[in-house]
Regions:
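C-terminal alpha-helical cap of glycosyltransferases
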Residues: 129-156
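Conserved acidic donor-binding segment of nucleotide-sugar-dependent glycosyltransferases
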Residues: 86-97, 105-110
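Short alpha-helical donor nucleotide-sugar binding micro-motif in glycosyltransferases
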Residues: 33-34, 41-46
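Short hydrophobic beta-strand element within catalytic cores of glycosyltransferases
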Residues: 62, 71-74, 84
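Aromatic "clamp/platform" in nucleotide-sugar-dependent glycosyltransferases that forms part
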Residues: 54
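A short, well-ordered alpha-helix in the C-terminal region of glycosyltransferases
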Residues: 112-126, 135
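Nucleotide-activated donor-binding/catalytic signature segment of Leloir-type glycosyltransferases, i.e.
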Residues: 14-34
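A short hydrophobic beta-strand element within the catalytic core of glycosyltransferases
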Residues: 49-50
Length: 156
């Protein structure tokens, strides 16, 4: 088992210190900034991706991973809940303990992992620009028809 942390940021020294404090140097790899091709390879080789974010506008990492068939374990916040279909393409959890429990559950259950991998690919297919545009037009068209007034009338 190996944990790969991708990206750079102000918390890197804290992560390195924690990894050293728990003796994780042999199984935790701080990849730093990676190219798009390297990121895709990491997604494809991962059993899951994880996010403990407390705020997220959109779970782009979760969406990118899903497109590679990689399920997510993430905190149940708005951005993640938009990107992940709970118990279909990943697990949405509450808090640090929930994240730890969710990761243990996913990593320890091959059947669950396989089911969520398939669900991740299906969810990613729903998150294309074309699919989003069609869904938005359907909502607009339905609303327009429901609120239409006879020709020649004005106001409510």
């Amino acid at each position: 088992l190996r944990l790969v942390i991708v990206g750079e940021g102000y918390m890197r020294p804290d992560f390195v210190a924690t990894i050293e404090a728990v003796g994780g140097q042999s199984w935790v790899h701080m990849a730093g900034h990676v190219s798009d091709d390297e990121l895709i390879d990491l997604y494809r080789s991962a059993w899951c991706v994880a996010s403990a974010s407390e705020r997220e506008g959109w779970g782009m990492t979760m969406t990118e991973a899903a497109a590679c068939g990689t399920p997510a374990v993430a905190t149940d916040i708005a951005g993640h809940a938009d990107a992940i279909r709970a118990d279909h393409s990943g697990l949405l959890v509450d808090g640090e303990q929930g994240l730890a429990d969710g990761l243990a559950r996913l990593l320890g259950d091959a059947a669950l992992r396989t089911r969520l991998q398939a669900g991740a690919l299906l969810r990613a297919a729903e998150l294309t620009w074309e699919h989003t545009a069609v869904a938005n037009f359907e909502v607009l068209a339905t609303g327009s028809v429901a609120n239409a007034r006879p020709l020649g009338t004005s106001g409510p």
